[in-house]
Amino acid sequence: MTLNEEIIAVVTPIVPVCVPDLLGTEAGETPPERYCTFNYSELAEGIGDNAAHLTRALVQVHYFAPLRESTIKTRHALRDAIAAVDDFTLPSIENATDETGQHYVLEFDAVGSWEAEDDG
């Protein structure tokens, strides 16, 4: 399983739309009101014999929702689901809401050995 697949598997039971990097929509298509995107930076971890045996990913999951909607249960469900994964740490939650909508960033570390992601 890739790290992308693992993140999507954890998030989609709570927020059904979850994509890496950016949610793209076609011309005239209305994006969902609630969705998640995610991104991460990768660092070598568990270095020995001139090789990295693990990867540490600094992950950000972005949760978007309409303004003035109660999102506390969803945010805590996301936090708890992420924390329940053995390779993931308990995330912090940063409020990045602006006038266009609610935006919460769940930041955590993921440490493991994942399959490579095909970016083509």
Indicate residue ranges for each PLM-predicted region:
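Small/polar-rich, solvent-exposed N-terminal microdomains that initiate assembly or binding
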Residues: 1-49, 69, 74
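Short, charged interaction patches at domain edges and termini
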Residues: 1-10, 41-56, 90-120
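Broad gene-expression machinery/nucleic-acid interaction feature
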Residues: 33-35, 58-60, 103-105
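Mid-chain, well-packed structural core segment of small domains
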Residues: 55-83
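Short beta-strand and beta-hairpin "edge-sheet" elements
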Residues: 77-91, 96
